[in-house]
Amino acid sequence: MVRVRFAPSPTGHLHVGGARTALFNWMFARKEGGKFILRIEDTDTERSSREYEQQILESLRWCGLDWDEGPDIGGDFGPYRQSERLEIYREYAEKLVEDKRAYYVVYDKEDPSKELFTTYEYPHEYKEKGHPVTIKFKVLPGKTSFEDLLKGYMEFDNSTLEDFIIMKSNGFPTYNFAVVVDDHLMRISHVFRGEDHLSNTPKQLMIYEAFGWEAPVFMHIPLILGSDRTPLSKRHGATSVEHFRREGILSRALMNYLALLGWRVEGDEIFTIEEKLQSFDPKDISNKGVIFDYQKLEWVNGKHMRRIDLEDLKREFIEWAKYAGKEIPSVDERYFSETLRICREKVNTLSQLYDIMYPFMNDDYEYEKDYVEKFLKREEAERVLEEAKKAFKDLNSWNMEEIEKTLRDLSEKGLASKKVVFQLIRGAVTGKLVTPGLFETIEVLGKERTLKRLERTLQFLKKT
């Protein structure tokens, strides 16, 4: 059975590179009818925290990536936190010492970086006197090779490696040792991970060989890069799933975009993961690094916002507002839906959607500085707004066609140019110069609200 794992370290928020690795593992497991395991690699005692662990789990859930075994739900091969498996690592490390494939190293008490001697016998006396003791793995001469699913045949000369620590003096394992023991005991069949782990692979394969265990199939995925073609980091901009969620990126759009980063997908590049799941093949992943394009992500997100059912978008928007701490004023349900319908055509994120919808939902909106300076301070502003108010008041049928006719008739009265007339009215009823189409904006606002807002702007004009 296919068994894959995603094993983050809880030392920070979930990076988009980690999310993409989790996605590829999850897709492979789901397509093959296998298991997706979540393991927490928290042996970095200084930087790891349960708070980060919970944030990572929450980000994965938001991404739509569920797991079959993990620290929160358990499973047949737990515990799923490395900090809860210390006795297991100690037992296996001591077995390597027994087999003369590893040995104890005793260090100077005053200078812990200074090795005093090595031994195959546990140095009780020195340990009791406070000397640091580690276990080192013995690197044998020769070559270590494996077939990478993406990169092909890989070979390393063992002479380039020195004996390396597998158990630290504090009783915690090092990464390369713990990951081998865990992957073997958890019966992991495939390891898909970033190519930054490629240099770890020969050490891990040596440990597999020392135990006489079969190694999993490895695939090392090229990293996500910044605009300067170096690994994506904070200096390029935001990198965490949590940030993009807070900015109003839909989870389905983020997963869509991350899948496009390196996976050759046939057909339309706007899709849900479920739509492409059965066509996923790890061998279709590119062997070249890919640049994270923030604008492309927004574009993909905008496509999804206009693609999904209005009720789904409404639910996503309300959930996002709660998460981002944004208040949604209480308005009529139908009015809210109509506002959402016309506003989603103009924006690419839920955050932008909130900004453009806000004046629709709040009568106490502010006027943009550009509107006031470029239009409201014009000599003809008051006359245009008064005429608009009168024309709308006399309008019996409130629909887009009649509204358009009314505004075009008004613009032909010679009060001002059509652009000035339209922008004066647009800003008067929303406070903004960029909105959905003016005619449909006024139609959705309704007659009563439009008249009140024109009067409000006239009063504002008289005070300034």
From Swiss-Prot:
Subcellular location: Cytoplasm
Keywords: Aminoacyl-tRNA synthetase, ATP-binding, Cytoplasm, Ligase, Nucleotide-binding, Protein biosynthesis
Enzyme class: ligase
Top-level division of the source organism's lineage: Bacteria
GO molecular function: ATP binding; glutamate-tRNA ligase activity; tRNA binding; zinc ion binding
GO cellular component, one term: cytosol
Signal sequence annotation: none
Short motif ('KMSKS' region): ranges: 231-235
Reaction it catalyzes: tRNA(Glu) + L-glutamate + ATP = L-glutamyl-tRNA(Glu) + AMP + diphosphate
Motif annotated as 'HIGH' region, chain positions: 8-18
Phosphoprotein among keywords: no
Assembly description: Monomer.
Family: Belongs to the class-I aminoacyl-tRNA synthetase family. Glutamate--tRNA ligase type 1 subfamily.
Function: Catalyzes the attachment of glutamate to tRNA(Glu) in a two-step reaction: glutamate is first activated by ATP to form Glu-AMP and then transferred to the acceptor end of tRNA(Glu).
Protein name as catalogued: Glutamate--tRNA ligase 1
Provenance organism: Thermotoga petrophila (strain ATCC BAA-488 / DSM 13995 / JCM 10881 / RKU-1)
Gene name tied to this protein: gltX1
